[in-house]
């Protein structure tokens, strides 16, 4: 039952992401996303930032955000999340989708739970820095979609991460 609920939540989250990019953005909305992208690139040089259509993706890939079996964010990277919060607060009509990930150590169920905790840890930092809780959606992906080789310790460290996707909130503009 727990696995079914997790799968249902992941499906809903993916639907949110896919629906968000399917609507036509206004020129102002597109400019806001472009400004968000440029601000992330400028203020967070340690991050990999990309713009894909109507979404901005941010990954602190080189950062060791989490120790093994931990959802506690490495204190060295809290300032990066604080900077991110300040940028997000300039664009209050955007949503933030946070995906948590693990390396391959641990069972699938354990990794799913741990990755959810990691996503929620990142969410808590954003909320503590005045990003509205209602704008943030967090979920765990477990060991899916590794960005580095899980056969090495260095690769496993990189896979213990969170990824952020910023997209425009269309609900705010419906009249």
Feature locations, PLM:
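Periplasmic OmpA-like peptidoglycan-binding domain that tethers envelope proteins to the cell wall
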Residues: 101-175
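Core alpha-helical elements of the protein kinase catalytic domain
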Residues: 17, 86, 123-124
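Residues at or immediately flanking beta-strands
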Residues: 48, 55-57, 95-97, 135-137, ...
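ATP/adenylate-binding site constellation spanning eukaryotic-like Ser/Thr protein kinases
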Residues: 9, 63, 78, 119, ...
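N-terminal targeting leaders that direct proteins to extracytoplasmic destinations
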Residues: 2-55, 79
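Soluble non-cytosolic domains of exported or imported proteins
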Residues: 31, 71-79, 105-117
């Amino acid at each position: 039952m727990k696995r079914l609920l997790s799968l249902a939540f992941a499906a809903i989250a993916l639907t949110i992401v896919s629906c968000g990019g399917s609507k036509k953005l206004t020129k102002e909305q597109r400019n806001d996303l472009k400004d968000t992208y440029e601000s992330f690139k400028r203020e967070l040089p340690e991050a990999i930032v990309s713009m894909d259509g109507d979404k901005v993706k941010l990954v602190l890939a080189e950062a060791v955000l989490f120790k093994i079996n931990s959802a506690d964010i490495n204190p060295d990277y809290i300032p990066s999340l604080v900077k991110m919060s300040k940028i997000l607060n300039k664009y209050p009509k955007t949503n933030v989708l946070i995906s948590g990930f693990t390396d391959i150590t641990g069972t699938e169920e354990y990794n799913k739970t741990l990755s959810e905790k990691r996503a929620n840890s990142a969410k808590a930092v954003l909320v503590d820095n005045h990003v509205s809780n209602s704008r943030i959606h967090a979920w765990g992906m477990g060991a899916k979609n590794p960005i580095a080789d899980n056969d090495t310790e260095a690769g496993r460290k990189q896979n213990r991460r969170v990824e952020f996707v910023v997209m425009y909130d269309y609900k705010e503009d419906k009249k």
